[in-house]
């Protein structure tokens, strides 16, 4: 049985970014990482790349000698805005089944050169199921252009505020929960995006879809916000995100009980 690369790590939350935000020159490394590959049912491969920006600011590196893939073409629609922190699955590339296995991403910042492994199709890098889903999420293999980073819809999740963090990742996603009318509820959304299209901005929005009263969000344009409900009842809320080309959204149901009612 061949071994596969297994990733363990904490969940990352991305607060909405804008391409117009100020960026600075890198003084710390931006480590590139090869997340691994998926062998698709149609015989093609999906290759996934990410990065870890150790700077305390977002860093912009334009395509060219300092941000390129080898072999050519160097510009494969890879990210040019490197958000601070670690970001897996930032670039997913679909390649034909006869792909030779030679592809490296190279970035030069802070006077140093950083690159991904050359062993693209090493069996150790074949992704496990959960990572496979993230690497291929939003990909239409029949329409995806080959050999370039494909823009995918933002990935969205809302964390259940009443979840047991020790019960496993599958229990963290919220579909419904209850609160009391006299309480302000925390809505902990998570939005991840690949930074494509280039020079675009990611727009995030909370809104009320239904309910007997009105919902007031403290910060409706951020994934993490707080909400107050005007009257008791059942409400449906939606967190959406768009990168100007693709939009994704998740819905949750919140049951608001009167203070003297049990949850």
Where are the predicted features?
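Proline/serine/threonine-rich low-complexity linkers at boundaries of modular beta-sandwich domains
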Residues: 25-28, 145-166
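Residue-level recognition of secondary-structure-to-loop junctions
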Residues: 39, 97, 227-231, 244
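Short, solvent-exposed loop/linker segments at the N-terminal edge
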Residues: 39-41, 173-185
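Short tyrosine-centred short linear motifs in exposed loops/low-complexity segments
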Residues: 43, 97-103, 231-235
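Extracellular acidic, Ser/Thr/Pro-rich low-complexity tracts
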Residues: 51-55, 190-197, 210, 243
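Low-complexity "stalk/linker" and mucin-like segments enriched in Ser/Thr/Pro/Ala/Gly
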Residues: 79, 173-174, 196-199, 207-223
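C-terminal edge beta-strand
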Residues: 248-258
């Amino acid at each position: 049985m061949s071994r596969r690369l297994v990733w363990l790590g904490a969940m990352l939350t991305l607060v909405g970014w804008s391409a117009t935000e100020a960026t600075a020159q890198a003084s710390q490394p931006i480590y590139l990482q090869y997340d691994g590959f998926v062998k698709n049912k149609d015989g093609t491969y999906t290759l996934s790349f990410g990065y870890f920006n150790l700077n305390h600011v977002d860093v912009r590196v334009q395509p060219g000698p300092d941000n390129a893939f080898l072999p050519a073409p160097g510009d494969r629609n890879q990210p040019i805005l490197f958000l601070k922190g670690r970001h897996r699955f930032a670039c997913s590339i679909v390649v034909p089944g006869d792909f030779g296995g030679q592809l490296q991403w190279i970035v030069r910042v802070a006077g140093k050169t950083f690159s991904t492994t050359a062993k693209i199709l090493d069996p150790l890098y074949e992704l496990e199921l959960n990572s496979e889903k993230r690497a291929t999420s939003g990909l239409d293999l029949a329409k995806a252009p080959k050999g370039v980073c494909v823009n995918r819809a933002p990935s969205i999740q809302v964390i259940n505020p009443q979840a047991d963090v020790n019960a496993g990742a599958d229990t963290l996603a919220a579909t419904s929960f209850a609160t009391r009318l006299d309480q302000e509820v925390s809505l902990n959304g998570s939005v991840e995006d690949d930074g494509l299209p280039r020079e675009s901005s990611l727009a995030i929005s909370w809104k009320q879809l239904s309910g007997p009263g009105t919902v007031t969000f403290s910060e409706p344009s951020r994934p993490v916000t707080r909400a107050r409900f005007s009257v008791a009842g059942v409400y449906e809320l939606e967190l959406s995100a768009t990168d100007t080309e693709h939009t994704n959204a998740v819905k949750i149901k919140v049951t608001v009980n009167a203070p003297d009612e049990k949850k």
